[in-house]
Each structure stands twice: as structure tokens, then as C-alpha cells.
């Protein structure tokens, strides 16, 4: 989940947290321009691809991490967090759509329809695999003495209205994150670092993007991102990962909630 800062907080962060957030933000700015220059000059990508990849691989994950000091230990307004994330995700997804489909249309970002039976089988299979990752991480976390972050627990929907908006957030995340980090980024990066390298790089960034879930959550979403990347490449279509990602978020966030999260007592 990505979003803003002050509108999400019931209590403001302290000065040390703001300084740390500013430092991380400046790091993101520097990394963004470094990636743009490298991709546009020595590599020779078109400027719009260089800028968009720099946003996906540097700016978005680093700026997401910059939010963490601001929201550590404060009360979150969940609805504001959901809506700001929805807007951010749709902007990101729309940018990837326009840039990624400019030459070859929707097929360039993997939006290729499968026959009904393969579509259902791939979507269900990836959903089950993703849920299995979540379930298996509970005993792993217990063995390692880890637990899910307080922030992740706090962001889970509680009321009917929150569950409704969280469902919209799940759709936005499933569509936009898959379009950005699988459908757009992997095909653009594959000629530069190979398909495997592109899948690994985008999977690592995808995990870091979920830093609000804590170290355990970063690893878990990274593994899940790897599963979805494999599903995209193996099926030849982005639709199964989009459907699976959306269903996983709905199941984990609304249906099962905290019962799937790891704690030291579990």
C-alpha cells in the first residue's frame, strides 16, 4: 500500500521521525535521477521508459519506506490510507498502461486473454499458491521468532465501510501493481538483464514496496511476487496474476484478517 503522510495520521510524528523521513526522501530523489540517467544514456532506453522505470524501481519503494518513520507509533485513519493508496495505485497503473501500450497495444503488457478453462485454472492455482505462502510463513515466523508489524495489523479493515473500501483497494492493487511490476517492467527490463533477472529485480522491489508490513512482510510479499511473476511468464498472460493478486488481498484482508498474521505467540 502506498499513500500520503499527514492526512493519514491522527497524531503527528516527532521531529526525529520527520528528519529521518526527509533523509530517506532525498535518497529516493537521488536514486531516481541516477536510474534515469543510466537507463537513458548508456542503456539507451526512450526517456519515458527511463523515467517510468526509475519511478517504479527507485522512487516508489524508497518514498514508501520514507513514510514509515512518520506513521510509526501513531494512530492511522484507515479510510484515508485506503483512499490515498487507491489514487496512487491508479495513477501508477494508468502511467504504465499509456507508456507500455504505446507501440504494440495491450499485448505489450501481457493483457492477453486466455481460453476460459486455462484462465480459471491459472487464476485459482496462483491464488492458492499465494495463500499457501501466507500460511507457511506463520510457522516459519514462529520458528524464527518474528511477527507481523503493528502497522499491518492496524491497517486491516474493521468496519463494514472499511471492508468495502478495502475491497476497492484490493482491485486497485491487483490491477495496478501487476500491470506495473509484471506487465510493464519485466518486458522492458528483459532485453537488458534477461527475463530471469527482470523477474528477480521486480520481485525484490515489490517486496520492499510493502515495507509497512515489516521485515517478515517484505520477505513474504517478495516470495508471493515471485510466484505471480512466474505465473505471468508461464501462462503468457497478465490476467491470472491480476485476478489472483486481487483475490489474495480480499481473502487475506477481509475474509481471514489477523488469523493469517504471524505473532510470537502463534
Range-by-range predicted roles:
Residues 1-111, 253-266:
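N-terminal, membrane-interfacial amphipathic/helix-forming hydrophobic leader that caps
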Residues 3-11, 26-40, 131, 135, ...:
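Transmembrane helix-loop-helix hairpins at the membrane interface
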Residues 27, 42-56, 86, 115-133, 222:
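Alpha-helical transmembrane segments
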Residues 55-69, 132-147:
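Membrane-water interface of transmembrane alpha-helices
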Residues 78, 119, 150-151:
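Exposed alpha-helical structural elements
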Residues 97-113, 174-189:
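Alpha-helical transmembrane segments and their membrane-interface junctions
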Residues 110-115, 156-160:
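Solvent-exposed, flexible loop/coil residues
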Amino acid at each position: 500500500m502506498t499513500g500520503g503522510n499527514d492526512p493519514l495520521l491522527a497524531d503527528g510524528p516527532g521531529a526525529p521521525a520527520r528528519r529521518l523521513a526527509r533523509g530517506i526522501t532525498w535518497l529516493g530523489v537521488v536514486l531516481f535521477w541516477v536510474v534515469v540517467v543510466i537507463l537513458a544514456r548508456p542503456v539507451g532506453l526512450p526517456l519515458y521508459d527511463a523515467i517510468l522505470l526509475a519511478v517504479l524501481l527507485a522512487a516508489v519503494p524508497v518514498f514508501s519506506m520514507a513514510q514509515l518513520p512518520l506513521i510509526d507509533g501513531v494512530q492511522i485513519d484507515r479510510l484515508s490510507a485506503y483512499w490515498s493508496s487507491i489514487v496512487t495505485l491508479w495513477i501508477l497503473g494508468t502511467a504504465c498502461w499509456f507508456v507500455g501500450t504505446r507501440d504494440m497495444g495491450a499485448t505489450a503488457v501481457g493483457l492477453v486473454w486466455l481460453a476460459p478453462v486455462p484462465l480459471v485454472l491459472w487464476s485459482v492455482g496462483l491464488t492458492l499458491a499465494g495463500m499457501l505462502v501466507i500460511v507457511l510463513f506463520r510457522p516459519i515466523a514462529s520458528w524464527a521468532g518474528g511477527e507481523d508489524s503493528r502497522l499491518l495489523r492496524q491497517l486491516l479493515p474493521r468496519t463494514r465501510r472499511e471492508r468495502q473500501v478495502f475491497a476497492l483497494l484490493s482491485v486497485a492493487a491487483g490491477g495496478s501493481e501487476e500491470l506495473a511490476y509484471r506487465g510493464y517492467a519485466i518486458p522492458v527490463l528483459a532485453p537488458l538483464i534477461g527475463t530471469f533477472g527482470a523477474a528477480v529485480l521486480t520481485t525484490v522491489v515489490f517486496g520492499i514496496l510493502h515495507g509497512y508490513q515489516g521485515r517478515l512482510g517484505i520477505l513474504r510479499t517478495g516470495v508471493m511476487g515471485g510466484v505471480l511473476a512466474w505465473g505471468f511468464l508461464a501462462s503468457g498472460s497478465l490476467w491470472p496474476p491480476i485476478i489472483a493478486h486481487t483475490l489474495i488481498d480480499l481473502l487475506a484482508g477481509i475474509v481471514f484478517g489477523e488469523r493469517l498474521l504471524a505473532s510470537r505467540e502463534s
